[in-house]
Amino acid sequence: MKTLVFNPFSGAAGDMILACALDLGADKQAVKELVEASAPVSMDIREVVKEGIKALDVRIKVPENEHVRTYPEIVDLVKAAKLPLQLEASTLSIFLKMAEAEAAVHGQPDLEMLHFHEVGQSDALADVIGSSAALHSLNCDSVYCTPINVGSGTIECAHGTLPVPAPATLEILRKGKLYFRGGSVNKELLTPTGAAILSHFAKPVETFPQGKAIAIGYGAGNADLPGPNVLQGVLLEPDSHLISDIIEVLETNADDVSGEVLGNLFEELLSMGARDVAIMPATMKKGRPAHIIKVIAKPEDSAKLARKIIVETGSLGVRVMPARHRLMAARNIERIKIELEGQEFETAVKVARDSEGVLLNISAEFEDCKKIAKASGIPVREIMRRTEEVARKLFS
């Protein structure tokens, strides 16, 4: 298993992501040939040193006096390139993110009429196709991105003077739920193309997940900054054969809340995306009876779940323990047939394996077994035992 973590401490652009992926081990010649066959560009790859850090630098050369393309023209170019299906889907998805962001910012609901400006040139097309091809070739099981340094100040572009991050970039970050922060450099450090590529491939994380570094890559940016203008990427190998997952733990103490309210909150949190909910009795100061509410959640869901807890319980705050690293088995739901007293029934079982396919556990789905118990008159405990017995023979 491999995990890729982008660490954009100096921002990110399309060419930086492409260069970083190449520096991590993607086939330089294969990606170069693909890019040059798919867009009217030439691609140069060279090593540079940015403030003491060696990095790969990718330069895309485009035809002079190139016209600004519309979104439909970009789509037609991508489809005409006859890319592999997975690569075409990624490329189209990334450009759709940029188109929807531009449309939202400029109040243009019809994407067919949308004109790209900075991202409508052939270099953006090359960056997206090249980055997608390189990242797919790394064959990572998961991709994460730490908070992105977006820079600060203002920029001059086709729409005039805009704040940093540019409105379209900010919209991409909002929809992609990526973490970001301002920086001390008075410059745009995150481009719309960079934001769209990262939001397509990566999930947000506040810190590096646990693992062993097996490769480190740096993609160089064009500008010279006070610090190294590079995008860092790290390939990690998890320390366990279990699958890694990034979670946050939300916790609060609640007193003067009825059991009915807590029961409703339990169901509401699960329906809103909580991975698990636990409510435990506790004793607070002065001997007051209370409950500890603990929720396991994906980082992108934490804010809405915390708000729900506060609204429903009247709690004055929720503790968030961020970026906890969870190791878990890969779990699949399989349907099997079992025979009971001459009758055949179908039921679901949960099959857990590690990353190498070793069987860790099998558990019968209670609701299915409950229905079979009612239909057959056999105790549900016996149904579950027989179901798991059959499943072990099938999946061991």
UniProtKB/Swiss-Prot annotation:
The keyword DNA-binding does not apply. It comes from Methanosarcina acetivorans (strain ATCC 35395 / DSM 2834 / JCM 12185 / C2A). The keyword Lyase does not apply. One of its GO terms (molecular function) is nickel cation binding. Keywords: Nickel. It comes from the Archaea. NCBIfam families: nickel pincer cofactor biosynthesis protein LarC. InterPro entries: Ni_insertion. This is Putative nickel insertion protein. Belongs to the LarC family.
